[in-house]
């Protein structure tokens, strides 16, 4: 049976675009909150194959999305590199900062992927239960974005600690990037082996970089990951998500050779249509706040996205993750409108 999501990545335009949502397994769902409460900590949920598989499948059962994305986190790679990673309630991730060349010199060059066996087992469990027409997405964080957390030891408003280190100590910073590139290649290949149909590389903080730094620290490492995966799996379908890239999107697509690019809601539609969608599939890009608002505002926002990208290959998604406060009825409203569309 065909998988519409994979068909788009393979070059086939669909009249009604396939649809899924970033963070579709999340706190807006009561069934997720129930499992999350049983799991204990966030990483406990990520590393419990039974629970991680369950929350991955929940939005598929409820909404029938065209793709499931494995429930995990971009910071499992630092964990596999031997770094301390913990999630504190109300504060987000905490790591031991790698903010000097001396500390960076202690970083392992390759991840111990046995620490991520639970992720691969969760993928196998989801694969066994997914409908035949539903794709399964594996993922990793892009090296730049993961490095911002590793350098600062936490999320920061403007990623200044990583940006400063990259300017002041580029050789030391490159060591972090190199370790993340090699580890991400191995991690993504193991996800494909475990049953993933496609992969997404999340570069959440790409948009804070200058054009020169974007080319060096976002696009180039992503290209290396794509090349490394395809050297072993030439048929691998890979989506890049350089959030906030804006006018740099065409260059990113050309440099990385991804099969599709996910875009946020600030992307200029004419630029994307003419210089991006003419070459690869486009995924996105509903504003999560429009989804949270609902009503006529949501209908208009959905229609705008559909009309903007109807002429080419398109996967309907949000421009970033769904917000926890979003009513389920608004997701149903969005899906009804997308599925009725005949572009």
Swiss-Prot record:
Homodimer. The record marks 73 as: Transition state stabilizer. InterPro entries: UROD/MetE-like_sf (IPR038071), Uroporphyrinogen_deCO2ase_HemE (IPR006361), Uroporphyrinogen_deCOase (IPR000257). It comes from Bradyrhizobium sp. (strain BTAi1 / ATCC BAA-1182). GO terms for cellular component: cytosol. It catalyses: uroporphyrinogen III + 4 H(+) = coproporphyrinogen III + 4 CO2. This is Uroporphyrinogen decarboxylase. HAMAP family: URO_D. It is an enzyme of class 4 (lyase). Belongs to the uroporphyrinogen decarboxylase family. The keyword Cytoplasm applies. It comes from the Bacteria. Its main location: cytoplasm.
């Amino acid at each position: 049976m065909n998988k519409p999501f994979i068909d788009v990545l393979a070059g086939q335009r669909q009249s009604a675009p396939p649809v899924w949502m970033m963070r579709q397994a999340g706190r807006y769902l009561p069934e997720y909150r129930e499992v999350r409460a049983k799991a204990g900590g966030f990483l406990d949920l990520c590393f419990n194959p039974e629970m991680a598989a369950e929350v991955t499948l929940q939005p598929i059962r409820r909404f029938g999305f065209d793709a499931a994305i494995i429930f995990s986190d971009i910071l499992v790679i630092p964990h596999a590199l031997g770094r301390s990673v913990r999630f504190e309630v109300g504060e987000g991730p905490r790591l031991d900062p790698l903010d000097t060349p001396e500390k960076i010199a202690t970083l392992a060059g390759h991840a111990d992927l046995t620490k991520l066996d639970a992720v691969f087992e969760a993928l196998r469990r989801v694969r066994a239960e997914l409908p035949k027409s539903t794709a399964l997405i594996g993922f990793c964080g892009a090296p730049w974005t993961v490095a911002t957390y590793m350098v600062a030891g936490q999320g920061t408003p403007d990623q200044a600690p990583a940006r400063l280190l990259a300017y002041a100590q580029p050789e030391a910073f490159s060591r972090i990037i190199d370790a993340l590139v090699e580890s991400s290649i191995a991690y993504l290949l193991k996800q494909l082996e475990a049953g993933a149909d496609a992969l997404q590389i999340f570069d959440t903080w790409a948009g804070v970089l200058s054009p020169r730094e974007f080319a060096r620290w976002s696009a180039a490492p992503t290209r290396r990951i794509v090349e490394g995966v395809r050297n072993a799996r030439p048929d691998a379908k890979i989506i890049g998500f350089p959030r906030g890239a804006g006018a740099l999107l065409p260059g990113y697509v050309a440099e990385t050779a991804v099969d599709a690019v996910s875009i946020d809601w600030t992307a200029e539609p004419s630029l994307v249509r003419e210089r991006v969608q003419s070459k690869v599939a486009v995924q996105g890009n509903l504003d999560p706040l429009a989804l949270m608002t609902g009503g006529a505002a949501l209908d208009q926002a959905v229609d705008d996205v559909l009309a903007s990208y109807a002429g080419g290959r398109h996967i309907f998604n949000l421009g970033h993750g769904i917000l926890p406060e979003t009513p389920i009825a608004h997701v149903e409203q969005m899906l009804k409108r997308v599925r009725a569309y005949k572009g």
